[in-house]
A protein has these predicted regions:
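Extended catalytic cores of very large enzyme megasubunits
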Residues: 1-245
Length: 247
């Protein structure tokens, strides 16, 4: 086991959880919450639990070194020290969590962006289209990305389809599929983050809302209903609002 860890650390200095916490506590002027969050979420570590950074100065040096490596491909590159001073003490630039974890990280494949909005080009109401989105969502979440996508294109419950079922199951089963996929993905103790949305004029919009309110049904996603001006005018004027009959 020692030999394996020695190989995995690639000759880098390592720190215990307590060493990193105490150094970070000093960095954050006694703020225990900030120190714990930084050590647990953003300090460079490998899958064996080895910690390679003792405080954010080490992290900022890692970021500066990697950004400088890319800078050197172009004319008039910024030096590593210049970039470090811009990042140091979170003074001028505070990167998102994804970049703080992912840039220069040779132990983990991580996204360099926190959030993604995804969807298929063209028709995406087929089961194959739904599965494609599910796979794309999982791959992004594996890399610490949060994901959002819209379900307004899915045919409402009872719509005719050309398969053995003859009619569509509607939005709710697909909400559950995406929600379950999100709960199954965990990276460094973090569950995937998912936002699902639907237009208020979709015939299944009420079922969409009810699904989230049903205990244990859609626990892996936040949901959002997109409201249009016509709906708001109907509310203000106490009028009826008609949804689309088809998608």
């Amino acid at each position: 086991q020692y030999a394996m860890n020695e190989y995995e650390t690639k000759g880098k200095d390592t720190y215990t959880q307590e060493e990193a916490f105490q150094s970070s506590l000093n960095y954050f002027n006694g703020d225990e919450l900030a120190a714990r969050v930084w050590v647990n979420k953003y300090a460079l570590k490998d899958s064996y639990g080895n910690i390679f950074e003792k405080n954010p100065d080490d992290m900022h040096r890692r970021l500066a070194k990697e950004i400088s490596r890319i800078e050197n491909r172009y004319p008039n590159p910024l030096s590593e020290d210049t970039i470090f001073e811009v990042l140091r003490d979170f003074k001028y630039i505070v990167p998102q969590g994804g970049p703080m974890t992912g840039i220069g990280n040779e132990f983990q494949i991580a996204s360099l962006s926190n959030c993604f909005v995804i969807g298929n080009e063209g028709p995406s109401d087929s089961y194959g289209g739904v599965m494609k989105i599910d796979q794309e969502q999982v791959q992004l979440m594996k890399r610490r990305g949060g994901v959002g996508h819209d379900l307004s294109h899915i045919r409402p419950k009872g719509s005719p389809v050309k398969n053995s079922a003859l009619t569509s199951t509607g939005i709710v089963p697909f909400m559950e599929r995406y929600s379950n996929s999100t709960r199954e993905v965990a990276q460094d103790g973090r569950r995937g983050a998912l936002m699902l949305s639907v237009s208020i004029n979709h015939p299944d919009s009420e079922s969409f809302i009810d699904a989230k309110m049903t205990e244990g049904k859609v626990t892996g996603a936040n949901v959002s209903v997109k409201i249009d001006d016509e709906f708001m005018r109907a509310v203000i004027n106490d009028e009826e609002y008609e949804d689309r009959k088809s998608v």
